[in-house]
Amino acid sequence: QLTRAAYGLDDIEQKESRGDATLTEDMVERNELTLHNVRLNDSRPLLDIYNQLQTFRTYYQFNDMDIDRYEIDGEYEQVFIGARELSTKDLPDQAKTWVNKNLRYTHGYGVSMSHVNKVTGQGQPEYMLRNIPVEGSLDVTQPQIYFGEEDYPSVITNSKVDEFDYPTGDENATNRYEADLGIPLKGINKALFAIKEGSFRTLFSDQLTKESQLLKHRNIIDRVNEIAPFFTYDDDPYIIVREDGSLAWIIDGYVRSDGYPYSEAYDGKENYIRNSVKAVVDAYSGEVNFYMVDEEDPLVQTYAKMFPDLFTEEIPEDVHAHFRYPVDLFKIQAKMYGTFHMSNLEVFYNREDYWEFPTEKYFNEDIEMDPYYITMKLAEEDKEEFILMMPYTPKKRQNMIAWMGVRNDGENYGDMFVYRFPKQKNVYGPQQIENRINQDSYISQQLNLWSQGGSKVIRGNLLVIPIEDTVLYVEPVYIESSNETSLPEVKQVIMAYEDHIVMEETFDKSLEKILKLVESGVKPEDVPEEPLDDDIEEGSEDGEKEQDESEDV
């Protein structure tokens, strides 16, 4: 009981799910938005694609891909988004001059965004925001990124040197930093900085002016640590596009302790954790705001009393709309709940009902599943919402016994729940589905055929998709040619429901086929094998071809 309280698990709503309801056309229609937002692109290959197709210059880099949700043209869309940051270490050697590194190359530029569930005809992501300058479905009015995830050095703005903004063919667009949050470089400040950096060029340079500012601590994690080092911070900040078109980073802050009475430690030491703080850093100005999001946490209340000016009270709506429950915290909580959901002392002592994370095949390796975000409609709700979820399997078994979720939207943010499946019924777990995919003669022959043709076959994340009282399983298949410049392309979608497994070119085709099999009452062993189809195009040789026309996959 005390361990559950220490990890915020004492108010979890427990629910029952049959897990075996029949998938029907009506059920699909009722959950259209859930199915519309099933993630088919995976972050790992997508990051490679963004870095090849959306950087345009060697000194730009996408550090990671983040999942978020936006309302675009009245539609709730789950998206991937990445920031195009500047990496001065990747400048050509001849360009690594003092002026370039300190005065000219000062910031990254813009973001790219793509649908989680759509690809072009070539299997590449369908962009919602792309290119330089930024084009697409949202207005990005202040695309300059002076503060980000990169290990940024200090730079000087408002010098006599125009700052590089972005490339425009044979010439470059320039920019001037217009915020006033830097350190004025005049008088004693200028001398102290020159001494600290060991750069007397700063002290005597005729390129600086009275308006010149020094921008320090430009790595956003370093920046928030300088202000509030008593919190620990999530290592996966994510960037958002605000309503005014500016860019901002959201960072989850944690309060931890090793002193909670009679609570089990999750890492051998600390036995209490709360995500009580959200830090928001403006990507342009570097302004930092801390927001308290768990007012019931006594430790964060203590910090608020010690530092009364630390927290900003009012959370802007366009920021709050992008709050995500952090994966790292949820993973800790889900791990602990796998043991401490047991309330019977004898069962707990013998670990008779221990739950663990399932495994899946990802990039052709068996790995432990991570929690993942999904857009879905809970059984008792009228509309879809952003959920972070994790399936469970019993210890040393592969069937799915339950799944845990936490809500992310609006006033329901942070509400946790668990759906249990009946112990007397077998609901397939992720690894069981992976094994059945391996054993399916048609699918395995197709995958082997493409591999033998010189292409690399990559199986993406297997997603468990709860649909009312049943479960759907979806796994994308990437094909990558052997060419050095090739990119992984989504070419097939594997879908499983109960005893049926199909593989088709698109999500819609796979779903349509599953529905036909269910409605016909045909058993899987009665389904004739399909002829091998070896006409799937190999990956694009130059990795840069795209089609304007796209399709739902």
Predicted features by range, described:
Residues 1-553:
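Soluble extracytoplasmic regions of secretory-pathway and membrane proteins
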